[in-house]
Each structure stands twice: as C-alpha cells, then as structure tokens.
Amino acid sequence: MKKKHKRLLITSGIFCFLSCIVFFILTTLKENISFFYTVSEAIVLQNSQKLIRVGGMVVENSVIRSESEVIFQMTDFNKSVVVKYQGILPPMFSEKSGVVVQGKMFDNSTFLADTVFAKHDENYMPKVLKQIP
C-alpha cells in the first residue's frame, strides 16, 4: 500500500472515530438537559401524549386540596392551565410562586402532572438555616 493511501486511511479512521465521540457526547447532553415549556407553548402541544415539563406561576387562590389529589392553576401571565397532581407537594410549593410540572397535556386546559418541582431564586435559604444566628 502506498504511503498516500495509508495516510488517507489513517486520517479517515481518525475522523470517523472523532465523529462518533462527538455524536455520543451530544446525545448524552441532550438527554440530560432539563428545559421546560411555558404554559402558552404547552397548550399548543395539546394531546401529544409525550412527557413534557411546563413552567409557570401558581395562580393565587387556585389551589384545591383533596385526599387523593391537588388541583391548581398555573400561568405564564399570558395563558393558564389547570394542573392535576396526585402525590406530596414539595415544601416550597405555594401560591404566587414558580413551579415546573412534569407530565402530559390532557387537553388545551388541563395538565396531568406526575411530578411537581418548586422553583426558588438564588437567595433561598432553608428555614432551619435562617434560625441559626
């Protein structure tokens, strides 16, 4: 085999190897990125039956608790959606606070949540630490 062909073969092999590495890195990063849709964007995705995350603010005086589920409204100050959730809410969940819910859009006004995440700003400090002088 000529030197020229050997060099071309080695260069092609290195290029293919590096391409595979970049592909696997990008695929892994895509799976680990946690983004969410706004309420307005999620309404457009109605009945997709795809697991999505939706972020917004809990509407004041909208939280209804029963023995089996919690129902509340979430808004992005443009549109609102009713969220139905069965489970224990995070301790920081409250009205007029930010939340991200994960689940499926049932119709253009109802979201069935599997998980509720309470959002907080960078100044958050747990109550236990606030009491320590």
UniProtKB/Swiss-Prot annotation:
Pfam families for this protein: CcmE
Localization (cell): Cell inner membrane
Top-level taxon in the UniProt lineage: Bacteria
Periplasmic topological domain residue ranges: 29-133
The keyword Iron appears for this protein: yes
One MF annotation (Gene Ontology) recorded for this entry: heme binding
Transmembrane segments: 8-28
Residues of the signal peptide: none
Principal location class: membrane
GO biological process, one term: cytochrome complex assembly
Mode of membrane association: Single-pass type II membrane protein
Keywords: Cell inner membrane, Cell membrane, Cytochrome c-type biogenesis, Heme, Iron, Membrane, Metal-binding, Signal-anchor, Transmembrane, Transmembrane helix
InterPro entries in the record: CcmE, CcmE-like_sf, NA-bd_OB-fold
The keyword Manganese appears for this protein: no
Record topological domains on the Cytoplasmic side: 1-7
Residue positions binding heme: H120, Y124
GO cellular component, one term: plasma membrane
Family, as annotated: Belongs to the CcmE/CycJ family.
Biological role stated in the UniProt entry: Heme chaperone required for the biogenesis of c-type cytochromes. Transiently binds heme delivered by CcmC and transfers the heme to apo-cytochromes in a process facilitated by CcmF and CcmH.
Protein name: Cytochrome c-type biogenesis protein CcmE
Biological source species: Wolbachia sp. subsp. Drosophila simulans (strain wRi)
Gene this protein is translated from: ccmE
